[in-house]
């Protein structure tokens, strides 16, 4: 579900928590070993949550999934978020601060008593927050277990194909993944790249996305220096 948490709505939070638990169980039943659940944050740049309150809400929120994660054999990924003000300016929101993100994951795994939590890095969200992708990946290290790969113009969450937006230097992405020995999936979160073309071009657009993902994989796993 999205949003996965409604911080100031008790009933909404309860409903989303229940839906997330069901989603975890469905993942397990389908043989999918990871799920991405967005963290809780205000979404209103004029009324952000107090940092301590935001921390406590999220620790409680994610901790509540531990029994279901264990029973389902699924790991839960947090994701870096962004926020946009009324003038269209984007800022990093919860989990854009990678140091804070590492603290979240390490704390939750300590509570769980095993490694049940990791991170999904969203390349488009990171661009909108103005953060360096190599630093983020290297700081996350083995905590990084999933990717949402897409591009945008730096202002809108376009979910466009790589090389069609503002991420001009994808080599920074490759360098980070190679540095940590990333072997996970190369998940292209690029629905808008398909949704914006005529039906006749959908097959070729899908081939382009598949070719791009395969190219990214090959570069990351190659022996030569990027």
Each model region followed by its residue ranges:
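Structural motif corresponding to the early beta-alpha repeats
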Residues: 1-60, 191-193
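Short, contiguous, pocket-lining structural segments
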Residues: 54-57, 93-97
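Active-site-proximal beta-alpha loop/turn segments in soluble metabolic enzymes
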Residues: 40-51, 78-93, 196-197
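Histidine-acidic metal/acid-base catalytic patches
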Residues: 17, 21-25, 31-33, 49, ...
């Amino acid at each position: 579900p999205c949003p996965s948490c409604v911080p100031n709505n008790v009933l909404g939070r309860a409903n989303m928590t229940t839906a997330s638990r069901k989603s975890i169980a469905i993942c397990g039943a389908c043989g999918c070993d990871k799920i991405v659940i967005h963290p809780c944050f205000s979404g209103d740049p004029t009324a952000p949550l107090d940092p301590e309150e935001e921390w406590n809400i999220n620790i409680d929120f994610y901790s509540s999934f531990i029994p279901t994660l264990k029973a389902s054999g699924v790991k839960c990924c947090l994701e870096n978020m962004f926020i946009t003000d009324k003038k269209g300016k984007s800022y990093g929101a919860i989990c854009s601060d990678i140091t804070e993100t590492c603290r979240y994951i390490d704390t939750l795994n300590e509570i769980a008593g095993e490694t049940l939590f990791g991170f999904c890095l969203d390349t488009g969200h990171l661009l909108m927050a103005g953060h360096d992708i190599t630093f983020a990946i290297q700081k996350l290290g083995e905590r990084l277990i999933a990717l949402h790969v897409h591009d945008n113009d730096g202002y809108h969450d376009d979910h466009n194909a790589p090389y069609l937006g503002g991420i001009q230097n994808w080599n920074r992405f490759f360098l980070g993944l190679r540095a940590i020995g990333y072997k996970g999936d190369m998940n292209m979160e690029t629905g808008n790249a398909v949704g914006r073309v005529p039906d006749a071009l959908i097959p070729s657009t899908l081939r382009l996305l598949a070719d791009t993902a395969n190219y990214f994989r090959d570069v990351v796993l190659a022996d030569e220096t990027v």
